[in-house]
């Protein structure tokens, strides 16, 4: 599911796929969150092959991890509703800052080269939607940063709604699959 957004060019979409990743990270820890992020990318590639020579997938992985890691590290330091909220806010802020800088420094220039178009053409797509977009930095400030803030807030709110009911199911399933049966003696 990818939802277009009115304030950014059409190649930017809100994708709620961080939701199961954050839930998994809350349930099983930061490493599990990163591994789930990686598996998410692999599944996406099986369902829909890359159209960006893996640059988009790299971006999705890195930006996703920039939210998941702070959120889950903070939550696992002392599991409570407060640390979940602080973790999600921190994760959203880190994702917004990292995603904005990553787009400005690496992704936009790489996509421009990859698609054989001047960087100004990409900036022009942002200008067509918002007259305040005049360069790379205003592009990421008015198009990328709001996208990441909205995505982080949406994933965080949905995680708060879904985590508590899913947590016992996830943990019971995990415990059942990892319990070793005593060996039988013959």
For the regions a language model picked out, list residue spans one by one.
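Alpha-helical transmembrane segments and their lipid-water interface positions
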Residues: 36, 40, 47, 67-71, ...
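Hydrophobic alpha-helical transmembrane segments
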Residues: 19, 34-38, 57-62, 85-90, ...
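Membrane-embedded alpha-helical segments of multi-pass membrane proteins
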Residues: 15-23, 58-66, 153
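Membrane-embedded alpha-helical hairpins and interfacial helices in multi-pass inner-membrane proteins
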Residues: 3-15, 54, 78-185
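Alpha-helical transmembrane segments and their immediate interhelical/interface regions
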Residues: 48-86
């Amino acid at each position: 599911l990818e939802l277009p957004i009115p304030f950014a060019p059409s190649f930017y979409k809100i994708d709620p796929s961080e939701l199961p990743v954050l839930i998994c990270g809350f349930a099983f820890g930061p490493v599990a969150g990163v591994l789930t992020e990686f598996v998410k990318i692999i599944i996406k590639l099986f369902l829909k092959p890359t159209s960006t020579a893996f640059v988009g997938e790299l971006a999705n992985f890195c930006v996703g991890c920039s939210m998941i890691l702070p959120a889950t590290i903070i939550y696992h330091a002392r599991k409570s509703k407060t640390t979940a909220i602080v973790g999600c806010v921190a994760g959203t802020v880190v994702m917004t800052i990292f995603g904005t800088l990553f787009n400005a420094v690496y992704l936009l220039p790489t996509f421009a080269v990859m698609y054989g178009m001047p960087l100004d053409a990409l900036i022009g797509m942002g200008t067509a939607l918002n007259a305040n977009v005049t360069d790379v930095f205003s592009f990421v400030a008015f198009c990328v940063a709001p996208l990441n803030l909205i995505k982080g807030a949406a994933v965080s709110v949905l995680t708060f709604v879904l985590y508590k009911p899913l947590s016992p199911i996830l943990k019971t399933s995990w415990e059942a699959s990892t319990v070793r049966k005593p060996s039988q003696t013959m």
